[in-house]
């Protein structure tokens, strides 16, 4: 099975190890992974800021980039959710709208792909930690994915997963929201950090780098000893340990 990796901006620039873990996971389950180098941002920051004309150009570029892919997989529910906006964005151009629909049909967030396409039953990973999981807004509300990450995490050996209070609430990142509405964003992330602390977790797991960056930054400034881990890193943890 051939898979094209959609790495996303944040993983590419700030969290390259997330890309490595994603590739290693996919290869472990028999996938042949390719990385189309011409890929760019999905266009979400421009789209959320109202620059829809510019976003259309990005959307068409990404549609072209992954046109020949069998499957497209990304370690970000938020960016995959943005692909779902392309169809509406290009509604006045039927040919491009149809191409956008085809892209969406073959694009998956990592945990979705592992559970729903590869039908993974065992993850063969271990993490001796008390952790909690942050459900990102875009992945939950726009992509509609709520269960796959938990299906995988419950199979990680040694992982004690605690329920995060009010897990459905936003962490305050929201892409450009955290820049445009900084005071509100800060209050939201402070509330999220309080809920994380209530669980007594040593590790916060998430499937979107933006959320992890926002929450992790706040936790670091508060001097709290809570580690941020992307879902891909957790699922690949034992493999990395063996290599080291």
Swiss-Prot record:
GO BP terms in the entry: lactate metabolic process
InterPro entries registered for this protein in UniProt: Cys_rich_dom, LutA
Molecular function, one GO term: oxidoreductase activity
Domain of life: Bacteria
GO cellular component, one term: cytosol
Pfam entry (one): CCG
Membership in a protein family: Belongs to the LutA/YkgE family.
Described function: Is involved in L-lactate degradation and allows cells to grow with lactate as the sole carbon source.
Name of the featured protein: Lactate utilization protein A
């Amino acid at each position: 099975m051939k898979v094209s990796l959609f790495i996303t901006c944040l993983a590419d620039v700030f969290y390259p190890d997330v890309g490595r873990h994603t590739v290693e996971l996919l290869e472990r389950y028999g996938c042949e992974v390719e990385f189309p180098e011409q890929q760019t941002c999905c266009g979400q920051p421009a789209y959320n800021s109202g620059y829809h004309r510019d976003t259309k150009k990005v959307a068409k570029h990404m549609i072209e980039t992954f046109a020949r892919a069998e499957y497209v997989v990304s370690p970000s529910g938020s960016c995959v959710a943005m692909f779902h906006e392309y169809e509406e964005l290009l509604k006045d151009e039927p040919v491009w709208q149809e191409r956008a629909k085809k892209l969406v049909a073959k694009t998956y967030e990592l945990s979705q792909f592992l559970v729903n396409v590869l039908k993974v039953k065992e993850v063969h990973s271990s993490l001796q930690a008390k952790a909690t999981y942050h459900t990102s807004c875009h992945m939950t509300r726009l992509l509609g994915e709520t269960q796959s990450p938990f299906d995988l995490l419950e199979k990680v050996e040694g992982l004690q997963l605690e329920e995060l209070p009010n897990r459905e609430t936003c962490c305050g990142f929201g892409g450009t929201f955290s820049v445009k509405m900084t005071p509100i964003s800060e209050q939201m992330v402070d509330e999220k950090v309080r809920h994380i602390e209530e669980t007594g977790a040593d590790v916060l797991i998430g499937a979107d780098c933006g959320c992890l960056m926002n929450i992790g930054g706040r936790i670091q400034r508060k001097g709290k000893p809570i580690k941020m881990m992307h879902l891909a890193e957790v699922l690949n943890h034992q493999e990395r340990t063996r290599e080291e």
